[in-house]
């Protein structure tokens, strides 16, 4: 009976450890995805600013 308890404890412990590792990797992946989205939105806003500067120069609305 003691052997069965130890085996069950070992299986549960290893399952929790692997679950913890998977959750950690998932969080890291989500953080990387968020960082990529922020970079893409920054690039888009830079393109818009460049376009507005160009249009302002053409229309004589310069600084």
Swiss-Prot record:
The modification Leucine amide is found at residue 61. Pfam families: FSAP_sig_propep (PF03032). Expressed by the skin glands. One of its GO terms (biological process) is defense response to bacterium. The keyword Hydrolase does not apply. Antimicrobial peptide with selective activity. Is only active against Micrococcus luteus (MIC=25 ug/ml) and not against Bacillus cereus, Escherichia coli, Leuconostoc mesenteroides, Micrococcus luteus, Pastewella haemolytica, Staphylococcus aureus, Streptococcus faecalis and Streptococcus uberis. This is Frenatin 1.1. It comes from Nyctimystes infrafrenatus.
């Amino acid at each position: 009976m003691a052997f069965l308890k130890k085996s069950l404890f070992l299986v549960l412990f290893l399952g929790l450890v692997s679950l913890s590792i998977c959750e950690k990797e998932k969080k890291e992946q989500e953080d990387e995805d968020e960082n990529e989205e922020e970079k893409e939105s920054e690039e888009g806003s830079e393109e818009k600013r460049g376009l507005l500067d160009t249009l302002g120069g053409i229309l004589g609305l310069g600084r």
